[in-house]
Structure formats: structure tokens, C-alpha cells
């Protein structure tokens, strides 16, 4: 026994020297990975692979971008390719299938660069992976379906690449999956049923079509949902019960019908619904909890370029950045909006291109410098001189709407 204890350090030392402490399989995988990628920069100062010297005694402590398990043979547990520094152009080349030999890997990260080719199918054999983040490169092909079988996957970020194909239905089985970011690719097909405890879903700027998953199939835990810039359609009633949402972006799709009143609440502090085909009114603040619609600093609501009608209610007064332009709102704007603009709480209020008849501002009150207000092309002569308004170029030069378009909404007309 004593003999064994004395020998043990020696054995460990010998195997460490022989294998450089690191598993030989992992070491040869790292070699393959390096051989298939290159630094775009030629300056060794901000190059990533400078430290990857395969004659070094302990790659686990000297290679940039890897961490290893403690015990010998050490296994690579996280791999981060690229420096991630803003002055580094990143890597070029392809992702070697040899990554799949790093069987203890829990995190795989590739920073911004111009890496091309597909995501190796074999990645799906790395059962311990919990984070896959391969963003801002030029990866092509479809997302390997094997990724959607990884039992420990928590975060999948493949945004800003050129990925095609569809999102497989097996994604719904991944109960550990919390964060899915596939934005800015060319992914098509429909949005499948999602994992029940998903927190963050970004599918923006793809080629998705069809409707959102049915109401009872939406993850109630969702806090962040963006599907902006796709070809999605159908009603928004499926979102009614998502009470945890703080960020919602459905802009630039073909959604129609009314906006569920449950989405008008201050905890949903960023809501982008612009450029759809939404109809109906902005609801009244709920009588039971009017405080639920007291929006704070940083809040943004964009309902522009829809077909919303009726008179504005107090619900959105106080939103810091508020776009209501290019709808069919009528009547007088409630005083609370005007007060919020003149107190500087609302910093942007776009109301142009509606059928609004009155913006009840007190004569001579100076507009705070920080405020961008646009009231043109409504059924009134704006009470604020054109030179004091901050209208976007797209608002056009006309101060008011032609009278013949307004007669139907002119309540003061006999
Ligand atoms: C994984 O490692 C084995 C043994 O070193 C090797 O034969 C095989 O080619 C490797 N796999 C890949 C995908 O590189
Ligand atoms: C928008 O909605 C209206 C009325 O529901 C419908 O007639 C029209 O076709 C829709 N437009 C688009 C682009 O979906
Ligand atoms: C609304 O009707 C009144 C009374 O006929 C008229 O004086 C006013 O110019 C009209 N306003 C607009 C914007 O058409």
C-alpha cells in the first residue's frame, strides 16, 4: 500500500509527460481543429492561434480558448474559437468534424469571423454540450438534426450565418433548452412546437412562414420573443397568456386581428408590432390594476404601419419611445400623452399619418429639446410649428391630411 502511494505521483508524472497531461484523442482533435481554421489577421498580436503550440508541455494551461478537466488525462471541457476582441477580424476556414472527438465538451463557442461550410453533423454526439454559440460567420447548410437530440443543451446561438433548412420538430423534446437564437439566417418552414420552459427565442430575419404555435403549445416561461422580419401570419391571441414576456418583436410580418389587451402592460417594456396588418383599438387601461400600464424609462412601443383605429386611450401615455404613426387613429389625443411629452418622460412620440383631430397642448409651452414629436398629416393643423417637430423624412412634407379624407372623422362637423 505504502509502495503504491509512493509510486502514484510518479505514474501520474510519467503519463503527464507522455500525453502532455491532456488526452491524446483530445490533443489530436485540437490539431485537426487548428489545421482547418486560420486567423484572418497576420499580426500575431491579435491572432487567436498564436498560443496553440503543440510542443508546449501543457496545452490545457497554455492554449487560448480551452479549459480542461482537472484529472489526468485532462479532457477539454470548453472550447472558444477566436479572441472575441472587437479589433480582431476572427477566423476563416471550416469547423473540423474532429470537434466531435472532444467528448467531454460542454461549451463550444466560435466568435465573429468568416468561417464557412456546414456545422459538422457529428456535433450531435457530444452529449455533454450545454452551450453551442457559433455566431456571425458564414456557416451554410441546415442545422444538424443531431443538435436537437442533445440532452443537456441549454443555449443554442447560431445567429448571423447563412443557414438554411427548417427547425426540426424534435426541438420540443429538449427540456433543458432555454435560449434559442437563430436570427439572421435563411431558415424556412414553420415554427415548430417549442420546449416548454424556453426563456429566450430569437428567430428574426429568416424566411419562416405560417402561424405561431397554438396557444397551449407556447412556452409560458418566455421572456424574450422575436420573430421580426419573416412571413408569419395569423392572430396574436396565442400570446395572451405569456405573462413573463418583457421583450416582444413581431414587426415586419403579416400578423392580423387585434392586439390582445394583456400585452399592454408596463412589464412588457419593449413591444415592436410595426408593419403588420393589425386592426382594432388600443384598449383602456385595466380598471382593476391601472398601475400595470404605467410605463417607465427605457420603455418602447412601436405599433406603426398597421390599421389600428379608434381614439387613443391613456394606456400608452408615458411610454418613453412611442410610435403610433401610419394607422387610422382618430379623435383627440388624451391630455396624459401631451403632459408626458412636455415633461420629457416621453422622448419620442410619432403620431403622423393618422386621422387625429386634436393634440391638446397649452399655448406657448416650450417643447423640451430632448423630445422628438411628429404630428403631421392628420386631420388638424398641428399646434406645434413644423420647425419644432422632429418628423422623419418618410413623414413627407404635408402638414395636414386633405380635408376630404377627414370629413368622415370630423366630429365637429355639422
Ligand atoms: C477521432 O479520433 C480517432 C482516434 O484518434 C480518429 O481515428 C478519428 O478519425 C477521429 N474522428 C474525427 C471525426 O476526426
Ligand atoms: C390585411 O387585413 C385585411 C382585413 O382583414 C385583409 O383584407 C387584407 O388582405 C390583409 N392584407 C394583408 C397584406 O395580409
Ligand atoms: C371639420 O369641420 C369643421 C366644421 O365644418 C371645419 O371648420 C373644419 O375645417 C373641419 N376640419 C377638418 C380637418 O376637416
Tell where the protein language model's regions lie, with residue ranges:
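LRR flanking "cap" motifs
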Residues: 38-94, 384-388, 403, 410-411
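The feature encodes a structural signal of leucine-rich repeats
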Residues: 92-100, 119-121, 140-145, 164-169, ...
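A generic tandem-repeat structural signature
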Residues: 97-215
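C-terminal capping segment of individual leucine-rich repeats
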Residues: 101, 125, 135, 149, ...
Amino acid at each position: 500500500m505504502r509502495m503504491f502511494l509512493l509510486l502514484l505521483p510518479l505514474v501520474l508524472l510519467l503519463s503527464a509527460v507522455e500525453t502532455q497531461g491532456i488526452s491524446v484523442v483530445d490533443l489530436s482533435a485540437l490539431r485537426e481543429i487548428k489545421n482547418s481554421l486560420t486567423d484572418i489577421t497576420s499580426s500575431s498580436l491579435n491572432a487567436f492561434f498564436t498560443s496553440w503550440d503543440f510542443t508546449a508541455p501543457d496545452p490545457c494551461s497554455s492554449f487560448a480558448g480551452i479549459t480542461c478537466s482537472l484529472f489526468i488525462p485532462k479532457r477539454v471541457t470548453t472550447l472558444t474559437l477566436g479572441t472575441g476582441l472587437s479589433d480582431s477580424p476572427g477566423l476563416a476556414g471550416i469547423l473540423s468534424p474532429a470537434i466531435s472527438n472532444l467528448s467531454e465538451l460542454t461549451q463550444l463557442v466560435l466568435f465573429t469571423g468568416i468561417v464557412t461550410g456546414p456545422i459538422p453533423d457529428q456535433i450531435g454526439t457530444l452529449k455533454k454540450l450545454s452551450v453551442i454559440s457559433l455566431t456571425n460567420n458564414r456557416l451554410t447548410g441546415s442545422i444538424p438534426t443531431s443538435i436537437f437530440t442533445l440532452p443537456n443543451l441549454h443555449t443554442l446561438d447560431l445567429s448571423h450565418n447563412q443557414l438554411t433548412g427548417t427547425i426540426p420538430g424534435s426541438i420540443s423534446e429538449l427540456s433543458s433548452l432555454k435560449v434559442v437564437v437563430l436570427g439572421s439566417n435563411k431558415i424556412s418552414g414553420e415554427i415548430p412546437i417549442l420546449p416548454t420552459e424556453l426563456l429566450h427565442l430569437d428567430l428574426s430575419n429568416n424566411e419562416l412562414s405560417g402561424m405561431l404555435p397554438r396557444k397551449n403549445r407556447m412556452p409560458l416561461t418566455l421572456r424574450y420573443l422575436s420573430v421580426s422580419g419573416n412571413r408569419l401570419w395569423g392572430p396574436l391571441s396565442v400570446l395572451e397568456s405569456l405573462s413573463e414576456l418583457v421583450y416582444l418583436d413581431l414587426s415586419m410580418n403579416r400578423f392580423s386581428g387585434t392586439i390582445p389587451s394583456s400585452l399592454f402592460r408596463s412589464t412588457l417594456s419593449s413591444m415592436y408590432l410595426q408593419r403588420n396588418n393589425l386592426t382594432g383599438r388600443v384598449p383602456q387601461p385595466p380598471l382593476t390594476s391601472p398601475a400595470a400600464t404605467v410605463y417607465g424609462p427605457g420603455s418602447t412601443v412601436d405599433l406603426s404601419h398597421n390599421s389600428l383605429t379608434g381614439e387613443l386611450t391613456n394606456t400608452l401615455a408615458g411610454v418613453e419611445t412611442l410610435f403610433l404613426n401610419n394607422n387610422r387613429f382618430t379623435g383627440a389625443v388624451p391630455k396624459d400623452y401631451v403632459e408626458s411629452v412636455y415633461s420629457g418622460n416621453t422622448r419620442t412620440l410619432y403620431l403622423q399619418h393618422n386621422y387625429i383631430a386634436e393634440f391638446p397642448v397649452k399655448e406657448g409651452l416650450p417643447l423640451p429639446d430632448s423630445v422628438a414629436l411628429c404630428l403631421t398629416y392628420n386631420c388638424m393643423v398641428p399646434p406645434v410649428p413644423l420647425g419644432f417637430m422632429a418628423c422623419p423624412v418618410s413623414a413627407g412634407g404635408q402638414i395636414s391630411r386633405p380635408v376630404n379624407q377627414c370629413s368622415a372623422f370630423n366630429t365637429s362637423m355639422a
